[in-house]
């Protein structure tokens, strides 16, 4: 699947590039690759979100941060919405 990034996710990627520890940056790279290959399974504890975030998925980068993304199967696209903080922190 193709990966696209929202403007907020692009800002988060830049933040990680400038401020992130190597372990987290490497994990983000691995998780994004996995998401492109199989968005609903794999490492980072993929989780379908519910309530006001229904239709979105998350994967753990570390204890505090998550990748939040949407799977648009009709377009064969994964839209990454966020790469920092926990979804309840937004």
Predicted region positions:
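Generic recognition of well-ordered alpha-helical segments
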Residues: 11, 30-33
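Enriched for short, Lys/Arg-rich terminal
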Residues: 2-4, 11-25, 50, 58-90
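A short, surface-exposed loop/turn module that caps and links secondary-structure elements
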Residues: 33-59
């Amino acid at each position: 699947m193709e990966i696209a990034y929202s403007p907020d996710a692009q800002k988060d990627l830049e933040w990680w590039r400038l401020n992130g520890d190597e372990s987290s940056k490497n994990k983000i790279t691995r998780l994004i690759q996995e998401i492109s290959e199989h968005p609903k399974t794999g490492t980072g504890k993929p989780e379908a979100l519910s309530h006001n975030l229904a239709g979105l998925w998350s994967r753990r980068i570390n204890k505090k941060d998550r990748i939040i993304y949407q799977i648009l199967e009709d377009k064969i696209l994964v839209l990454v919405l966020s790469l920092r903080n926990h979804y309840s922190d937004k």
